[in-house]
């Protein structure tokens, strides 16, 4: 609210960072309810781990986003995880899928296309979070949403 005083409850907030991935229904300034959360790795944590796997520098979010600029987001078919809880998310399987792509390429003595894999990963994360946020907005009737946390700074949004 500090930087956007025009944002008035009720609204939904996607908090996506290295430590949290939550969809929060904000009913009033002191009354909120967590609708969904990550069941394993937070989105930012997944970005950091994927960056390390791809040989990109820390922090992973900006590094993956920068590499993804020239990549093809459709080059790799990464999984869409299915989890219990309508608004919950999971990123550990996605992170493992990236590691598996890198390992497959190494076993075949092939080069991995870092921009393509970064773009595919970034697109999948953004798609998962956007889908859950829009589903929550439709179900709650929320007219406003906000994004918070380091992952929210990703240019893909």
Which positions does each model-derived feature cover?
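Conserved phosphate-binding catalytic cores of ATP/NTP-utilizing and phosphoryl-transfer enzymes
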Residues: 1-11
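Glycine-rich phosphate-binding loop plus the immediately following alpha-helix
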Residues: 5, 20, 27-70, 95-96, ...
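A generic structural signal for well-ordered coil/turn residues at beta-strand boundaries
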Residues: 10, 19-20, 72, 85
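A short, small-residue-rich loop immediately preceding and capping a beta-strand
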Residues: 11-14, 143-145
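Short beta-strand scaffold segments in enzyme catalytic cores
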Residues: 13-15, 21-25
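Glycine-rich beta-strand-to-loop/alpha-helix junction loops that act as flexible
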Residues: 17, 145-154
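A contiguous, well-structured pocket-lining segment that forms one wall/lid of small-molecule binding clefts
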Residues: 65-145, 155-157
């Amino acid at each position: 609210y500090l930087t956007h005083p025009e944002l008035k409850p009720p609204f939904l907030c996607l908090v996506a960072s290295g430590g949290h991935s939550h969809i929060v229904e904000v009913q009033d300034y002191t009354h909120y309810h967590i609708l969904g959360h990550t069941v394993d790795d937070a989105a930012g944590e997944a970005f950091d781990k994927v960056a390390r796997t791809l040989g990109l520098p820390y922090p992973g979010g900006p590094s993956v986003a920068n590499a993804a600029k020239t990549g093809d987001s459709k080059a790799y078919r990464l999984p869409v995880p299915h989890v219990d809880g309508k608004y919950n998310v999971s990123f550990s399987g996605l992170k493992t899928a990236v590691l598996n792509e890198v390992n497959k390429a190494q076993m075949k003595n092939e080069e991995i296309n870092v921009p393509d894999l970064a773009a595919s990963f970034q697109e999948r994360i953004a798609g998962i979070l956007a889908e859950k946020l829009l589903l929550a907005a439709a179900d709650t009737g929320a007219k406003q949403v906000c994004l918070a946390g380091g992952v929210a700074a990703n240019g893909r949004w």
